[in-house]
């Protein structure tokens, strides 16, 4: 550091960290110990998947059904499968099954039990389903699910599988707990191997893991209290926090430790730490801000799962940045020169490793690319477009039990139900109809008959069922049957009517995700219903509401991310074109990542190898989630590399030289950071939750492509093709400071000295004019 330069605030921050290093470590240790027990309990208190739009028409309809008919989301479907292929649809068999399940009726939380009456598929008579209505709300049912499951009696000669919303949510919570452990078992050792290869010592390699684990545990512990206060937090949150916290926490620590090790070569521990905070610490702050853009944008979509990802992502990134600028520097200050302790290899091999690092590998690649920029650009873009192509045929849907693999009882039971019954009836559109009088009053019968007759004539309707079906279309027949107490009791038992409320099931001609089914839901909601007040809900309506919520704000999300990213890069690079190029390249890596996800999860290519049970669709929320996360991380790598190129360009005025030196300075570190992020995030590919598998695969592919093919090949090629135009901006807007000092520590410019190996780049061969 120059003697005449003024220390920056971050330099002084590093000095203070060094002087208070023991107190800072003890404070973090105390915080970790306090929050760890709550972090471990977080998955067990999350009761919702976060898909349900608050106050949506479908949610209002469900509430009306629960109030008026006692139809609650807290229910179970018990799928009974005969071991001897006995016909369980026969009356005697169904009577026997209900008798064997009769002990359930004595339980205080069981409201009713009855056989499902939906249309059946041929050849599956050995499978039947029993609906168990619970006298509990959804949260209480989930908390008592294991007790409920334990009280289900066995059926002689048959196997029983419990599914339904409550069972699926319970299994999802179990999957979250096991997935976190599995991902850590896979990801942390893999990250440690990469860190050992980068640093060469066990001491240095362990520090980023400590920072990552502390960031995750602290974040999850803090979010435990938020989840207690807000019951809508998604049960995907712990997986997301673990994935992102380990990835960015270890990546940020990699930058800090790398710079500190290099500075220790020629400085004492205090000065080395101060310079590390002023350079690498600044880069980590800027990187954290870049990643926060995408997470902030998620909050614009009014769905609990997006809000949960947004809160979790923002919190864990902020904590990771804080840990990287407080805990980690304090640990480094305590270690000092002992950071080089416990080497992995003998000294002679370590020296050879240094020679390889200084061999100019990345510089040579850059110069080769810039010698053939057109050919390489065309080849790389063609390859990426080929990976992006499957996105054109992407079919999005909202999963339910499909988020779990078939080894889970709730998923397997759901698959059996789909086999045995008409899927369209199981996922029918449900209309809660408020009648003008009691359901057996002629006015109510007349009004509901007019409504159902009109619905039957609508395009896309296969069948309409209601309590009027007992009269086969005749008002007189309906009145005749309703005069019998046993018929009324049976209708009320099956939750078809009660007082002034009736339920109408509209079975669509097509699947629940078909465009005509979606239009049918919209038509039902806008049609005139004289004498009735109708609320349209059911699975197709519920999923349509989710899609509408996303589409309502997607333009705002994209616009916010692009606009804020452009402004930040415009300020950082003082260039009009470079931010546009960065966004274009981010979209290429993002599109390629989504393309691979479509190949695997929709088309089934490689699905068996990855343990994916593909359904021919993609989780509808996935493209937005991947976009928001990848865009921030890719911008992080872009800033890391282009800032170093800019520093060399402003010093030399030579675009080609600056590009080669920039890649040489940052290529190894960007690749290492990307590999660490990829193995941590990629570990979730081998977990049970299909949504997290897809997110893990998409992020891994996108980040690896961004840090390798795009940063190593496409960036140098475009830098060469655009030449000095890369650096153009109006003088009145952002004047460029040419011939700036290389002492980046003492400037206010955005720098990525933290992303370098600590070596100053060599001067170019030609002479440069002295700075005025």
Label each residue range with its predicted role.
Residues 30, 78-79, 381-382, 429-432:
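Short coil/turn segments at secondary-structure boundaries
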Residues 54-75, 82-166, 393-607, 617, ...:
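Structured non-transmembrane domains adjacent to transmembrane bundles in polytopic membrane proteins
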